[in-house]
């Protein structure tokens, strides 16, 4: 396919136009009085949202050279969303400001590589200053404040604070759609996975259609169990111990299943068979988690354990197990607290090392099941469009809150960045590197300026007033007052603010050092078709 080549000013100009198109669309959503954007997504569905990354993902520009600029900023928003879960609009505004200032300086003859070094040094200095200013999220009220600011809804803040209160900082909080109006919070204690009983004969409570085993032994088996002869020696030992048995295996079938069912119906002893969750390596990992949680060993030929040779020592225990048609919950497994902590540390290390979002999500689910439990927030609304918008806001608020618990909070409303930019005063840079740092200093005021502009105030005036206020004070765009933001509960997670700045600077550094771009040449339309289309109707003058 033939390519189009653009060089120097033409190339950078096209990239800047692309950046501006995307950023101008996203930045109208910034702040408590930011507006929404209506998106026509694939299949002509309509989404209304004020979530920066959702808007950015939908934008593809017609001009291919400009589209490259837009895609670079989309990367800023997406990366910030992956790391911190919020702050995507702030990141986009920062990127736009740095691109605009940076390209102006490049056009005036500054050295792009020196600018990039200056930008990087400035970002590190501001980032360190933000961390130094951050304070821990201590109370449930502060957690509620973070979530309220992110979702712009106090009811959401209260529900999320309750959820974190129950599951702790490593717990999983999932957001699901509900058929009823409003918000509901449900809590699942213990380890739950989405596989139910293999046969309905195992049910112990016919009214609720579930099997409940108190103080059971738990057998974890990696393969299928189909031959009763392999199984019977272990079953006899369990019957003698007088406790029920939960069997988790790839499958239980044939004679083995019949043996369990017959004994259950006769009342000889109570058991439930469940298929292991996941498949392949993930199934192995989840069985390993259950083994640690219950104090069991996974029976598998790989580790030299055969079903017909093992005794009670390979079985795990739990206070109780509840199995429904669709899921199994193990409450208070008998594993040692130390082993569970080791396993949690191991999974945390894997989360830090992985590049794949999907893997990270699955690892975090496993971590939560071991560490705390799972809270489910159900959200409902009158229409599909409103439901989507609410769900977006809730997911963002959960991410922002988790970020706040991890690294702490700073004053919100764009003022923390502005105040932290005073860290650049002590940087001893010269020449174009100093110019690079001043680009970051100017950009650091932009989020505050747009929060003010979107609320109908004069942005530059607000910025110069806030600059003179003490750290932690700033502009409350909701009321138009200059006040102590932290005391008012207007706070941002420092991780969100830092990620926004770091990711914006990373892409801008690359964009400034661009000297040429190569894009596919659009296919020519046949001449006649174009003419007929354009001049089909001649109006009399």
UniProtKB/Swiss-Prot annotation:
Q: Which domain of life is it from?
A: Bacteria
Gene Ontology MF: a single term: isomerase activity
Record-linked Pfam families: Cpn60_TCP1
**Where primarily located?**
cytoplasm
EC assignment: the record states 5.6.1.7
**What CDD domains has UniProt attached to this entry?**
GroEL
Question: What GO cellular component term, any one, is given?
Answer: cytoplasm
Q: Which InterPro entries match?
A: Chaperonin_Cpn60_CS, Cpn60/GroEL, Cpn60/GroEL/TCP-1, GroEL-like_apical_dom_sf, GROEL-like_equatorial_sf, TCP-1-like_intermed_sf
User: What subunit structure does UniProt give?
Assistant: Forms a cylinder of 14 subunits composed of two heptameric rings stacked back-to-back. Interacts with the co-chaperonin GroES.
UniProt name for this protein: Chaperonin GroEL 2
The source organism is Acidothermus cellulolyticus (strain ATCC 43068 / DSM 8971 / 11B)
